[in-house]
Amino acid sequence: MSNIGIIIPERAADIGNFMVGRLLPFIEKRSVGPFVFIDHMGPAYLKDYQNLDVPPHPHIGLSTLTYLFEGSIFHRDSIGSAIEIQPGAVNWMTAGKGVTHSERTPEYLRHTDKRLHGLQIWVALPKHLEGSEPSFHHTEAADIPAWETDGVHYKLIAGEAFGKTSPVPVHSKLYFIEIKTGDKHAKISIGNDLYGESALYILEGNIKSEGNTYEPKFILIAKDAKLCEFEMDANTTVYIFGGEPFPEERYIHWNFVNSDKQVIEQAKHDWKDQKFPKVPGETEFVPLPATSLK
């Protein structure tokens, strides 16, 4: 990767009863293409008395993408969706004008030892879709485009790249790509397949570029779309994400994303007044925090 512009470290963040590694936003780089938020969950080893319990909370102006490496999460939302997500599958929830959802350990796992590891991602919506009706789409792992080239394994989790299109129904030009090596190192050259802004997240293993070695838990932001050439060690996994940025700035407060600060202010009042749609089967209420997202 011959044109690294910014290197972002993973930073610890508390999301209630669960610690995560925050990758975006970052003070020097608030977004990459339409991607405005990425949390790395785990890897966590939960005892039989420990569970993931993220109670009902709201979103506007974005789509959430949940992708697991290990474990399982049960998703419920105010649209009526109720589904378990397992490794390799994708949950894509578009908040639009407003949605509420919860994420919890499935009931059948709540009294067992378990592992949880994955990514939680927010993708901003185009301005004309920020007030759209909410929707939810689940894509099974078997339906995600996957292929092998010269011993390197690729998955196009979302978006368009390499002449392929993921079935995940995204709303703008973007890509979210998994690249894995096996027991051999590999040279990667994919600059011509990308567009817009680009970044690379190292999940495990190491990559080398221009004599430098980069280890896990860092995002490398490219100066342009050409994440040109880099070498992956054996047993390395990276995620490349990005796409075309929007012309308007995006503002973030708590779980709200929008190009208009007044829309966020209205969403804050609506959540305080409990005017957001409810999640069937859920009764908890999370108060609006006093501070904005860092």
At which residue positions do the language-model features occur?
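Jelly-roll (double-stranded beta-helix
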Residues: M1-K294
